[in-house]
């Protein structure tokens, strides 16, 4: 194999696609069951009430309601508050 580059070759030209991570639904926003709230690598946010966690650590709503971000035992958690419990 050649160890020197040939004519018009380059060692550059590679780039990976963005992973589109981050918060998808913000505090106070209404979500339906199954809607993705946060896409993440690792548990930056932990699931709280009425929130499930996928195998890739994605957080999603288990029932309809409003998103609430908070803290529990020093961890950042995401909760979904059911519609009836949210004051007008």
Curated annotation (Swiss-Prot):
Annotated Gene Ontology cellular component terms: cytosolic large ribosomal subunit
Where is the region Disordered? Answer: 1-21
Which keywords does UniProt give here? Ribonucleoprotein, Ribosomal protein
Cited Gene3D superfamilies: 2.40.50.100
> Single GO molecular-function term?
structural constituent of ribosome
Instruction: State the PROSITE patterns in the record.
Output: RIBOSOMAL_L27
Q: Does the keyword Oxidoreductase apply?
A: no
Q: Which GO terms describe its biological process?
A: translation
UniProt xrefs under Pfam families: Ribosomal_L27 (PF01016)
| Annotated Polar residues bias | 7-19
**Keyword Ribosomal protein annotated:** yes
Q: Which domain of life is it from?
A: Bacteria
Q: What family does this chain come from, according to its entry? A: Belongs to the bacterial ribosomal protein bL27 family.
Q: Give the NCBIfam families listed for this entry.
A: L27
* The protein's name: Large ribosomal subunit protein bL27
> Which organism is this protein's natural source?
Frankia casuarinae (strain DSM 45818 / CECT 9043 / HFP020203 / CcI3)
